[in-house]
A protein has these predicted regions:
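A detector for small-residue-rich transmembrane helices and their helix-helix packing motifs
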Residues: 2-262
Length: 262
């Protein structure tokens, strides 16, 4: 005869194994390295004032540096600064609130993009959007002497690129999202299809409205004080939105396959 199955009193029933909980926000290595780079570079504020100002003049983006009518004026950094400042300005910040604000916006969107692109593509993308922001600032401030600094053109680019896939079913702004890696690698919508998505359009309207009215992230430091370089944000944003596909390693979905419904 078989013995009846052993029964446990309710008070000594074995507890089921706890389900693994995914952290709300996990940072990929590429994004962590980028944020650490910003933090390390920001230690320049500990330098003597003259030397700190020199770093801004050499690595900040100064539109007047490209004014051909100023042949007799030499800017710090020489001819090389005409090249590297298209990117290096984005690694400089005025103070902790400036760098903290940019990092805060970078965390959700940059995290998804770094997982999707991988380290090399991610850093190349950040450099490209920084350069696009500098070009937009140069086009609208041709004779400005105030150096522009701040990562917000690149941050804006990550936000624009991320909305190409953020609302797709299973992605990180979808109600049916999977784990962080899977959410970052859903097929992106074709641009024309994304621009028909009401949520994408709402995001675009809010983003452009906030930037035009208030300005966020990048600043220009001059004798007249600090001003927001919102044109650089728009340059980085448009570059991220339009050039996303050049960096995206995930095969594109057909318009009917990339269903944006959550």
């Amino acid at each position: 005869l078989e013995s009846p199955p052993e029964e446990f009193p309710p008070e000594i029933l074995p507890e089921p194994p706890a389900a693994a909980r995914e952290p709300l926000l996990t940072l990929p290595a590429a994004l962590t390295a980028y944020i650490l780079l910003l933090a390390i570079i920001h230690l320049r504020v500990l330098l003597p004032p003259d030397l700190e100002n020199w770093t801004i003049d050499v690595f900040g983006f100064i539109p007047k540096r490209y004014d051909s009518s100023l042949l007799a004026i030499g800017f710090p950094g020489g001819e090389g600064a005409k090249v590297w400042t298209f990117v290096t300005y984005s690694l400089l910040h005025a103070n902790l609130s400036h760098i903290g604000f940019n990092v805060l916006w970078l965390l959700p969107f940059g995290s998804a993009l770094a997982r999707r692109f991988g380290a090399v593509r991610f850093f190349a993308f950040m450099a490209m959007t920084a350069a696009a922001g500098a070009l937009a600032h140069l086009a609208t401030h041709e004779h400005a002497l105030a150096p522009m600094i701040g990562a917000s053109a690149s941050v804006s680019g990550t936000m624009a690129a991320a909305i190409r896939f953020a609302f797709v079913r299973g992605s990180f702004l979808s109600f049916s999202r999977g784990d962080a890696d899977a959410a970052a690698r859903v097929p992106a919508q074709p641009l024309w299809h994304a621009l028909r998505d009401r949520r994408v359009l709402a995001f675009l309207a809010i983003w452009f409205g906030v930037n035009i009215v208030f300005g966020l992230g990048s600043i220009a430091i001059g004798a007249e004080g600090v001003s927001v370089a919102w044109q650089a944000h728009i340059g980085g944003f448009l570059a991220g939105l339009l050039l996303f596909s050049l960096f995206d390693p995930v095969p594109r979905a057909a318009a009917d396959a990339a269903d944006a419904s959550s």
